[in-house]
Curated annotation (Swiss-Prot):
Heme c binds at C19, C22, H23, M85. The keyword Thylakoid does not apply. It is found in: Mitochondrion intermembrane space. Binds 1 heme c group covalently per subunit. Pfam families: Cytochrom_C. SUPFAM superfamilies: Cytochrome c. It comes from the Eukaryota. Its main location: mitochondrion. GO terms for cellular component: mitochondrial intermembrane space. GO terms for molecular function: electron transfer activity; heme binding; metal ion binding. Keywords: Electron transport, Heme, Iron, Metal-binding, Mitochondrion, Respiratory chain, Transport. The keyword Transport applies. It comes from Rosellinia necatrix (White root-rot fungus). This is Cytochrome c.
């Protein structure tokens, strides 16, 4: 299974409760504990300027798309062993679809 369009309101709630502590969405908001997510889709792993990524993130070399995020967000440490992202993941497909749909809209 892969990504399918989700609920934006539920995605916003997930972002607020699970992601906003470490990530920003809008251009110019900058990095926090985690890298800024503005321009996320189409970007390569480990490529946000000014953020201190692990070598694992820099060397993964994939492009962030709906499908790569769908897999990554289920279990970040499994997808990129050595990442410093301290998030256990979203196990439910629906939650990942909701969050990715929201991120697609808000990070453009």
């Amino acid at each position: 299974m892969g990504f399918s369009a989700g609920d934006l309101k539920k995605g916003e709630k997930l972002f607020t409760t699970r992601c906003a502590q470490c990530h920003t969405l809008k251009e110019g908001e900058g990095n926090k504990v985690g890298p800024a997510l503005h321009g996320l889709f189409g970007r390569k792993t480990g490529s946000v300027e000014g953020y201190a990524y692990t070598d694992a993130n820099k060397q993964k070399g994939i492009e962030w798309t709906e499908d790569t995020l769908f897999t990554y967000l289920e279990n970040p440490k499994k997808y990129i062993p050595g990442t410093k992202m301290a998030f256990g993941g979203l196990k439910k497909d629906k939650d990942r679809n909701d969050l990715i749909s929201y991120l697609k809209k808000e990070t453009a």
